[in-house]
């Protein structure tokens, strides 16, 4: 049986639904979904400049979990930028 996922504290949401390369129709692009907790981890680490421990405390998760989350988010952003994919920000009601 899988361990239950600890609820993360998330203070905001993305300003837009997605970011994509200019001039390419959305339906022609591969989509890379970044989860709300991944976006929050990026915000805390890269925008706010918090240490991993400070950011983990603010999200209510362990430092190790925070590190894994921000690593996953950075990979998805880099993949989208380098390979020209659409980066989408699904909300809790989405099925992505």
From Swiss-Prot:
InterPro entries: RNA_pol_sigma_r3/r4-like (IPR013324), UPF0251 (IPR002852), WH-like_DNA-bd_sf (IPR036388). Gene3D superfamilies: Winged helix-like DNA-binding domain superfamily/Winged helix DNA-binding domain. Pfam families: DUF134 (PF02001). Signal peptide: none annotated. It comes from the Bacteria. Belongs to the UPF0251 family. HAMAP family: UPF0251. This is UPF0251 protein VPA0321. It comes from Vibrio parahaemolyticus serotype O3:K6 (strain RIMD 2210633).
